[in-house]
């Protein structure tokens, strides 16, 4: 079996960094899919649907271009949301929303859902899976919240925090996959590759 290249259908620097950390250097092709068109209230279904839509947008673009060198590739799409008290949160729209969100999050336990969609163009197969990690937030004070939001890091992240950045200071612990919280569960990605007949070491 010819080993394809991996296309990351995301502009997330964190997801790109995770893949490079394990020896995979993907082609980055950010999806322009409009996430606001998907209205689902169940978080697992929401992130799986969005991840698949992002990957399919890139797949359709590749097939329309009829570029043979790309038509045997694997396309990875991901999407993450945080759930606190049955409320689904993505990226905050502005600093005030981020501050208000953190005032609700502090001292709480949230569920971080990341949907993963992997399309194998050569085999015409798609695998869609989700992983959930529990995140225990610290009892941070208003001054810490305002200072953190001023860095603008929370504005770039689903869930309003980056566990691999400054936000890691305010996370007591997690239950589950660490990289899932960053935006891509590496162990789950390995399983998805296996299900398509590949070994992760094929991509090193």
Curated annotation (Swiss-Prot):
UniProt similarity note: Belongs to the Maf family.
Gene3D superfamilies associated with the record: 3.90.950.10
Example of a GO MF term: nucleoside triphosphate diphosphatase activity
Protein's name according to its UniProt entry: Nucleoside triphosphate pyrophosphatase
Species lineage: Bacteria, Bacillati, Cyanobacteriota, Cyanophyceae, Oscillatoriophycideae
Biological role: Nucleoside triphosphate pyrophosphatase. May have a dual role in cell division arrest and in preventing the incorporation of modified nucleotides into cellular nucleic acids.
Annotated source species: Trichodesmium erythraeum (strain IMS101)
Reaction(s) catalysed (UniProt annotation): a ribonucleoside 5'-triphosphate + H2O = a ribonucleoside 5'-phosphate + diphosphate + H(+); a 2'-deoxyribonucleoside 5'-triphosphate + H2O = a 2'-deoxyribonucleoside 5'-phosphate + diphosphate + H(+)
HAMAP family given in the database record: Maf
Assigned keywords, A-Z: Cytoplasm, Hydrolase, Nucleotide metabolism
Domain of life: Bacteria
Residues of the active site: 79 (proton acceptor)
Essential cofactor(s): a divalent metal cation
Top-level enzyme category: hydrolase
Subcellular location: Cytoplasm
Enzyme Commission number, as recorded: 3.6.1.9
